[in-house]
C-alpha cells in the first residue's frame, strides 16, 4: 500500500495569490480545518511546499 500523508488547511485562502488558491484546490482543501489524506508523491510534496504557510502535514 502506498504511503499517505494527512494535510490540514490552517489558514484562510482569502487575499492569497491566485496560484496558491489553485494549489489548495488541487490538494482538495476547501476551508480552514479541512483535512485530506493524500498519497505521498513528489508532485504532492511540491504542492505542499508551495503553500506550507497555510497547511499542516502529518506523516
From Swiss-Prot:
It holds the Pfam family Ribosomal_L30. One of its GO terms (cellular component) is cytosolic large ribosomal subunit. InterPro entries: Ribo_uL30_ferredoxin-like_sf, Ribosomal_uL30_bac-type, Ribosomal_uL30_CS, Ribosomal_uL30_ferredoxin-like. One of its GO terms (molecular function) is structural constituent of ribosome. The keyword Signal does not apply. The keyword Ribonucleoprotein applies. Keywords: Ribonucleoprotein, Ribosomal protein. GO terms for biological process: translation. Belongs to the universal ribosomal protein uL30 family. NCBIfam families: rpmD_bact (TIGR01308). Part of the 50S ribosomal subunit. This is Large ribosomal subunit protein uL30. The gene is rpmD.
Amino acid at each position: 500500500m502506498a504511503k499517505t500523508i494527512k494535510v490540514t488547511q490552517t489558514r484562510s485562502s482569502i487575499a492569497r495569490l491566485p496560484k496558491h488558491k489553485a494549489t489548495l484546490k488541487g490538494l482538495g482543501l476547501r476551508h480552514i480545518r479541512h483535512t485530506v489524506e493524500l498519497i505521498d508523491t513528489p508532485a504532492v510534496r511540491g504542492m505542499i511546499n508551495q503553500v506550507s504557510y497555510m497547511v499542516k502535514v502529518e506523516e
